[in-house]
Amino acid sequence: TDATLYAGVRPWQGGEVWINPEMDQGFGLSNTLGVAGFPSAEAYKVGKSNPYFRLQRLFFRQTINLGGARDDATATLNQFAARRTADRVVLTLGKFGVGDVFDTNRYAHDPRADFLNWPLVHAGSFDYAADAWGYSTGAAVEWYRGPWTVRAGLFNLSKIPNGEMLERDFSQFQLDGEIEHRHTIGDRDGAVRVTVFRNHGRFGRFDDALALAVKTGTAPDTALVRDWRTRIGASVNLEQAVTASVGVFARAGIADGQIEPYDFTDFARTAPASLSIPRASARHATRPPHHPTH
């Protein structure tokens, strides 16, 4: 279980500061181990029997309008209502989830309102930078131009794969890039996103771990063969409204399967697709998603 506070202030026009302190308690099923596509995106990689405090987000966002048609923001969690133009630049700095900006999807991104399975909330092969709770420190910039958006980001990796502590100096880091195109088919909105990532840090190769295990007669362990390496991957993300409430979505991704994943989960290939039919009372995009990690 968790309880999260969403508090923000608007220091000047276009500027926002948000803080999300959180109280957590409990464990994922089997300590969140045993399956790469874990069935609950509300489960963290760590757990405690007693309630504990975490500062999950503390970030600054600046929106710079560049003209074009009106595209106002509506008020929601971690977002003030604001006048915006279709052409704009958005800068985000601080501690937040990589998934707050990258690989979003109207129908499959928020485990509290959409689907629960990890590779449906994010592309399973998207080894996004995060601590064990799913958040990182860094910066992202977004450039909106008509139906197009281009995004780039730089984030700290955790000190060790799946670790609780993040780097502070970008000595181990992730670079993210994304391009999005929004469209209409008939009168129904849709979008296509292509996301790429590049992780640089101390990773282990599976073949090196196996070779060492054969040589020493011990169990394979990638922690024993970690060295400075780069791991890259890419994914495609599609959403399309069918009716006012029903939509379809799909993701497909690929990453280097010879190197251990760093901060998300153990996928080298992924290709889910599904149909979203919410209950009459359900509402999508009501809160920023939690960002699960395994």
Language model features with spans:
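Repeated loop/turn-to-beta-strand initiation elements of outer-membrane beta-barrel proteins
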Residues: G14-V17, L66-D71, P147-A152, I185-V192, ...
